[in-house]
Amino acid sequence: MLKRIGLELLHHIPFTAAGAVTGIAAMALVTLFNTPMNVSEALFFTFHPLHVVFSAMVTTAIFRRNKNSRLWLTIIVGYVGSVGVATLSDAIIPYLEGKSLQIDMEFHLPLISTEIMPYFNVPHWVIVNAAAIIGIIIGYFKPNTKFPHMIHVLISTWASLFGFTAFGTADWLPLLPVLFVFLFLAVWLPCCVSDIVFPLLWVKGEPAHAHH
Protein backbone atom coordinates (compact mmCIF):
# COMPACT_ATOMS: atom_id res chain seq x y z
CA MET A 1 0.00 0.00 0.00
CA LEU A 2 2.82 2.43 0.85
CA LYS A 3 4.37 1.89 -2.57
CA ARG A 4 1.06 2.65 -4.28
CA ILE A 5 0.55 5.77 -2.19
CA GLY A 6 4.04 6.94 -3.15
CA LEU A 7 3.32 6.37 -6.83
CA GLU A 8 0.04 8.27 -6.58
CA LEU A 9 1.78 11.19 -4.85
CA LEU A 10 4.35 11.34 -7.66
CA HIS A 11 1.60 11.10 -10.27
CA HIS A 12 -0.17 14.13 -8.79
CA ILE A 13 2.83 16.43 -8.70
CA PRO A 14 2.04 17.90 -12.18
CA PHE A 15 -1.62 18.52 -11.19
CA THR A 16 -0.59 20.29 -8.02
CA ALA A 17 2.18 22.31 -9.68
CA ALA A 18 -0.26 23.51 -12.35
CA GLY A 19 -2.73 24.51 -9.65
CA ALA A 20 -0.01 26.38 -7.75
CA VAL A 21 0.86 28.32 -10.93
CA THR A 22 -2.75 29.52 -11.23
CA GLY A 23 -2.66 30.48 -7.56
CA ILE A 24 0.50 32.53 -7.96
CA ALA A 25 -0.97 34.27 -11.02
CA ALA A 26 -4.10 35.11 -9.03
CA MET A 27 -2.03 36.38 -6.10
CA ALA A 28 -0.04 38.62 -8.46
CA LEU A 29 -3.30 40.12 -9.76
CA VAL A 30 -4.63 40.59 -6.23
CA THR A 31 -1.44 42.47 -5.32
CA LEU A 32 -1.22 44.57 -8.48
CA PHE A 33 -4.83 45.70 -8.19
CA ASN A 34 -4.56 46.33 -4.43
CA THR A 35 -7.54 44.10 -3.74
CA PRO A 36 -9.03 44.90 -0.30
CA MET A 37 -8.67 42.22 2.35
CA ASN A 38 -12.44 41.94 2.76
CA VAL A 39 -12.69 40.93 -0.91
CA SER A 40 -9.98 38.30 -0.36
CA GLU A 41 -11.89 37.13 2.71
CA ALA A 42 -15.11 36.79 0.71
CA LEU A 43 -13.24 34.82 -1.95
CA PHE A 44 -11.68 32.61 0.72
CA PHE A 45 -15.13 31.84 2.08
CA THR A 46 -16.26 30.98 -1.42
CA PHE A 47 -13.48 28.53 -2.26
CA HIS A 48 -13.04 27.08 1.24
CA PRO A 49 -16.67 25.86 1.48
CA LEU A 50 -16.43 24.51 -2.08
CA HIS A 51 -13.34 22.61 -0.98
CA VAL A 52 -15.25 21.23 2.01
CA VAL A 53 -18.20 20.17 -0.19
CA PHE A 54 -15.94 18.38 -2.66
CA SER A 55 -13.94 16.58 0.04
CA ALA A 56 -17.09 15.56 1.93
CA MET A 57 -18.65 14.15 -1.24
CA VAL A 58 -15.60 12.06 -2.11
CA THR A 59 -14.86 10.78 1.39
CA THR A 60 -18.50 9.97 2.19
CA ALA A 61 -19.07 8.29 -1.17
CA ILE A 62 -16.02 6.06 -0.79
CA PHE A 63 -16.98 5.02 2.73
CA ARG A 64 -20.63 4.57 1.77
CA ARG A 65 -19.88 2.32 -1.21
CA ASN A 66 -17.38 0.11 0.50
CA LYS A 67 -18.40 -0.08 4.14
CA ASN A 68 -21.78 -1.26 5.35
CA SER A 69 -21.58 1.07 8.33
CA ARG A 70 -24.11 2.93 10.37
CA LEU A 71 -25.20 6.40 9.32
CA TRP A 72 -23.56 8.12 12.27
CA LEU A 73 -20.16 6.59 11.44
CA THR A 74 -20.49 7.59 7.78
CA ILE A 75 -21.24 11.16 8.87
CA ILE A 76 -18.19 11.24 11.16
CA VAL A 77 -15.89 9.93 8.42
CA GLY A 78 -17.32 12.39 5.88
CA TYR A 79 -17.03 15.33 8.26
CA VAL A 80 -13.51 14.64 9.52
CA GLY A 81 -12.26 13.78 6.03
CA SER A 82 -13.58 17.06 4.64
CA VAL A 83 -13.57 19.76 7.30
CA GLY A 84 -10.40 18.39 8.89
CA VAL A 85 -8.43 18.21 5.65
CA ALA A 86 -9.77 21.51 4.27
CA THR A 87 -9.01 23.32 7.54
CA LEU A 88 -5.46 21.97 7.48
CA SER A 89 -4.89 22.85 3.83
CA ASP A 90 -6.68 26.21 3.65
CA ALA A 91 -6.16 27.70 7.11
CA ILE A 92 -3.57 26.02 9.34
CA ILE A 93 -0.80 25.38 6.80
CA PRO A 94 -1.01 28.88 5.21
CA TYR A 95 -0.87 30.40 8.71
CA LEU A 96 2.21 28.38 9.69
CA GLU A 97 3.90 29.05 6.37
CA GLY A 98 3.13 32.77 6.61
CA LYS A 99 4.53 32.98 10.13
CA SER A 100 7.68 31.17 8.98
CA LEU A 101 8.20 34.08 6.56
CA GLN A 102 7.53 36.58 9.37
CA ILE A 103 4.30 37.68 7.70
CA ASP A 104 1.72 39.31 9.95
CA MET A 105 -0.88 36.50 9.85
CA GLU A 106 -4.17 36.25 11.73
CA PHE A 107 -4.93 32.73 12.97
CA HIS A 108 -8.41 31.86 11.79
CA LEU A 109 -10.32 28.57 12.09
CA PRO A 110 -13.37 28.86 9.82
CA LEU A 111 -15.21 25.85 11.27
CA ILE A 112 -15.60 27.56 14.68
CA SER A 113 -15.39 31.25 13.73
CA THR A 114 -18.38 33.38 14.76
CA GLU A 115 -17.30 36.33 12.63
CA ILE A 116 -19.76 37.48 10.00
CA MET A 117 -18.78 36.81 6.41
CA PRO A 118 -18.56 39.96 4.23
CA TYR A 119 -21.38 40.42 1.70
CA PHE A 120 -23.35 37.40 3.01
CA ASN A 121 -23.97 38.36 6.66
CA VAL A 122 -23.67 34.75 7.83
CA PRO A 123 -21.23 33.45 10.48
CA HIS A 124 -18.22 31.63 9.06
CA TRP A 125 -18.91 28.42 11.00
CA VAL A 126 -22.43 28.18 9.55
CA ILE A 127 -21.14 28.32 5.97
CA VAL A 128 -18.37 25.77 6.53
CA ASN A 129 -20.48 23.27 8.43
CA ALA A 130 -23.38 23.65 6.00
CA ALA A 131 -20.94 22.90 3.18
CA ALA A 132 -19.86 19.71 4.95
CA ILE A 133 -23.47 18.64 5.45
CA ILE A 134 -24.28 19.26 1.78
CA GLY A 135 -21.25 17.26 0.67
CA ILE A 136 -22.06 14.39 3.03
CA ILE A 137 -25.67 14.24 1.80
CA ILE A 138 -24.60 14.18 -1.85
CA GLY A 139 -21.91 11.57 -1.18
CA TYR A 140 -24.34 9.41 0.81
CA PHE A 141 -27.20 9.40 -1.68
CA LYS A 142 -25.10 9.70 -4.87
CA PRO A 143 -22.05 7.59 -3.99
CA ASN A 144 -21.16 6.89 -7.62
CA THR A 145 -20.50 10.56 -8.39
CA LYS A 146 -17.00 11.07 -9.83
CA PHE A 147 -14.94 14.24 -10.20
CA PRO A 148 -11.54 14.98 -11.73
CA HIS A 149 -8.83 15.37 -9.11
CA MET A 150 -7.72 18.57 -10.88
CA ILE A 151 -10.93 20.30 -9.75
CA HIS A 152 -10.08 19.51 -6.14
CA VAL A 153 -6.53 20.76 -6.64
CA LEU A 154 -7.65 24.08 -8.15
CA ILE A 155 -10.31 24.74 -5.52
CA SER A 156 -7.90 23.92 -2.70
CA THR A 157 -5.14 26.06 -4.27
CA TRP A 158 -7.37 29.11 -4.52
CA ALA A 159 -8.70 28.60 -0.99
CA SER A 160 -5.13 28.40 0.34
CA LEU A 161 -4.13 31.43 -1.74
CA PHE A 162 -6.89 33.60 -0.32
CA GLY A 163 -6.08 32.21 3.11
CA PHE A 164 -2.81 34.13 2.73
CA THR A 165 -4.25 37.37 1.37
CA ALA A 166 -7.39 37.44 3.55
CA PHE A 167 -5.61 36.90 6.86
CA GLY A 168 -2.08 38.10 6.12
CA THR A 169 -0.52 41.50 5.43
CA ALA A 170 2.65 41.66 3.36
CA ASP A 171 4.29 42.86 0.16
CA TRP A 172 3.36 39.70 -1.72
CA LEU A 173 5.13 40.21 -5.06
CA PRO A 174 8.71 39.56 -3.82
CA LEU A 175 7.42 36.49 -1.98
CA LEU A 176 5.74 34.83 -4.97
CA PRO A 177 8.54 32.32 -5.72
CA VAL A 178 8.55 31.09 -2.12
CA LEU A 179 4.76 31.14 -1.97
CA PHE A 180 4.64 28.90 -5.04
CA VAL A 181 6.44 26.22 -3.02
CA PHE A 182 4.23 26.86 0.00
CA LEU A 183 1.02 26.68 -2.06
CA PHE A 184 2.24 23.46 -3.63
CA LEU A 185 2.86 21.86 -0.23
CA ALA A 186 -0.36 23.20 1.30
CA VAL A 187 -2.37 21.53 -1.46
CA TRP A 188 -0.34 18.46 -2.46
CA LEU A 189 -0.19 16.57 0.84
CA PRO A 190 -3.66 17.32 2.30
CA CYS A 191 -5.53 16.88 -0.99
CA CYS A 192 -3.70 13.68 -1.80
CA VAL A 193 -4.47 12.38 1.68
CA SER A 194 -8.14 13.19 1.11
CA ASP A 195 -8.42 11.94 -2.47
CA ILE A 196 -5.85 9.12 -2.47
CA VAL A 197 -5.08 7.79 1.00
CA PHE A 198 -8.75 7.62 1.97
CA PRO A 199 -9.62 5.65 -1.19
CA LEU A 200 -6.70 3.30 -0.61
CA LEU A 201 -7.87 2.73 2.96
CA TRP A 202 -11.52 2.08 2.13
CA VAL A 203 -11.53 0.87 -1.49
CA LYS A 204 -10.24 -2.44 -2.74
CA GLY A 205 -10.37 -1.35 -6.38
CA GLU A 206 -9.77 2.01 -8.03
CA PRO A 207 -10.10 5.30 -6.16
CA ALA A 208 -13.45 7.02 -6.32
CA HIS A 209 -12.29 10.06 -8.24
CA ALA A 210 -11.18 10.18 -11.86
CA HIS A 211 -7.67 11.21 -12.84
CA HIS A 212 -7.75 13.64 -15.76
Kindly give the residue locations of the regions a language model identified.
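N-terminal topogenic module of multi-pass integral membrane proteins
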Residues: 1-72
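C-terminal transmembrane helix-loop-helix hairpin of multi-pass membrane proteins
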Residues: 3-19, 140-212
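Transmembrane helix-loop junctions in multi-pass membrane proteins
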Residues: 26-39, 65-69, 84, 88-97, ...
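Membrane-interface interhelical loops and short amphipathic "cap" helices
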Residues: 31-44, 97-109, 172-179, 184
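Alpha-helical transmembrane segments of polytopic membrane proteins
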Residues: 44-55, 118-129, 182-187
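Hydrophobic cores of alpha-helical transmembrane segments in multi-pass inner/ER membrane proteins
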Residues: 52-63, 129-135, 184, 190-200
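Membrane-interface alpha-helices at helix entry/exit sites of multi-pass transporters
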Residues: 68-77, 211
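Membrane-proximal helix-loop-helix units in multi-pass membrane proteins
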Residues: 80, 84-160
